[in-house]
Amino acid sequence: MDHYRPVWDIWSQFILSQTDSALRRDGLQETFPIEIPGGEHLVINTSTAPIIYSKGGSVLRQIRGFIGDDAFQRGLRDYLRRHAYGCADSLQFWEAFETVSDQPVSEIMRAWVEQPGHPLVRVHRDGQTLTLSQERFTYLPGDFQGCWPIPLTLRLFDPDGSERWMRVLMRGKTLQVDIGAAEAVKINDGQAGFYRVFYERYADLTALGKRVRDRQLSAEDRWGLQSDLFARVQAGEVAFRAYLAFLECYAEEDAFLPLVSIDGHLRHSHLIGDAATREAAAVAGRQIAERVLASIGWHPAPEEAHVTAALRDQLLWHAVLYGSEAAQAFADGAFQPVSYTHLTLPTKEAGCGGG
C-alpha cells in the first residue's frame, strides 16, 4: 500500500496505531505472550488485542526490517505457494523466511511470540566500544526474567560526514560492538525493532538530537527517540524537564508521526502531572500547536493528506486545553455558524479529535 499510495503515509499510521499502542500495553507488569501455550482460550478485547494483533504485526515488521524487503516478500510467496489450500502453523511460516534469508528466523520468533513483554536495550559508550545490555521493559519496577534474540540495526555517523550501517543479532544479555570513531550511533534504525532504547550517557542522546534538528534522521527515528525517552519518564528514570529539553531539537518539526506523538505525551503529562508539570506541558504544547497550525493552516486545504487533517484535529483540540488564545478564538468563530441557523459540517470547519 505504501508503494502505491505514499501520500497516505501508511507506515506512520501503522507505527502510531499499532506499534505504539502495543508497546504501551506490553509495558505493563501484567502482560502475556502473542501465542498462548497449549491452545488456551483467550478472549479478544481491548486488553488482549494490542498484544495479539498490534504486537504481532509489529514483530513481523521487525523481521522484515532484519532480513530485508526482498527476502521477506520471497519468503511470504514461498509460504503461500507451499501451503495453498492446506493447513500450516506458525513454525512453518518462520521456516519460510529462514530458508530464503539464511537467518535464524525461527529461533528469533519463538522467543518473541512465546514469552511475555519486550526488551529495553541500554546503551553505554566507552570510547570506540558500545556496550549493549537487555532487560524486560516495564513502567513499574519488578524482578522479571526473559532474554530475547534482538535483531539490531545500528546507524553510525562518522566525523567525515559518511554513514555506516551494522546489523547484529543480540542473543545474550549483553553485547559489545566496536563502532570505531563514530560521532553518533542510532540504535534501531528506522524503528523497525519492537524494543525500547535508553542511551545512558546524555551526550550520546544529544549527538542524535543534532541529527534530529538537521533532519538527518527519518520521521520514524525522530518519533522513536522521543518516544523511548518519554517511556523512561513514565518509568521514573528520567525527569520530565529532561524530556522537554530534548524537545528543543524538534523546534522545526513538521512530520505527522513525531508531532502527533509529542503532542500526545504533552497532553498525558498535562492531564496527570503536578502543577509544575502541567504548566510546563501546557507551555510546550501551546508553542508547538500554534506553530504547526500556522504552518498547515487552521482550515483544511483541498486535497491535503489525511495525516495532515488528523494532525490538525488533534492539535486544535489540545491547543484549547493548553490555553492557546488563537485556538480558542478560532474555535469560537467556527462554532458561531453552527450554533445558529447555518448548516456547517464540523469536520470541514473545526473538527476536533478526542483527548
For the regions a protein language model found, what residue spans apply to each?
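Generic structural signal for hydrophobic residues
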Residues: 93, 150-152, 315
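Beta-strand-rich binding/interaction modules
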Residues: 105-106, 118-186
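Residue-level detector of functionally special positions within alpha-helical transmembrane segments
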Residues: 68, 171-173, 188, 344
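Structured loops at beta-to-helix junctions and adjacent beta-edge loops in soluble globular domains
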Residues: 37, 63, 133-135, 155-157, ...
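Solvent-exposed, flexible loop/coil residues
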Residues: 38, 89, 172, 198-201, ...
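Long, ordered, helix-rich scaffold segments
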Residues: 20-21, 27, 49-50, 56, ...
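Hydrophobic alpha-helical and helix-loop surface patches within well-folded domains
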Residues: 1-143, 268, 272, 276-295
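Residue-level detector of conserved catalytic or cofactor/ligand-binding positions
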Residues: 338, 342-354
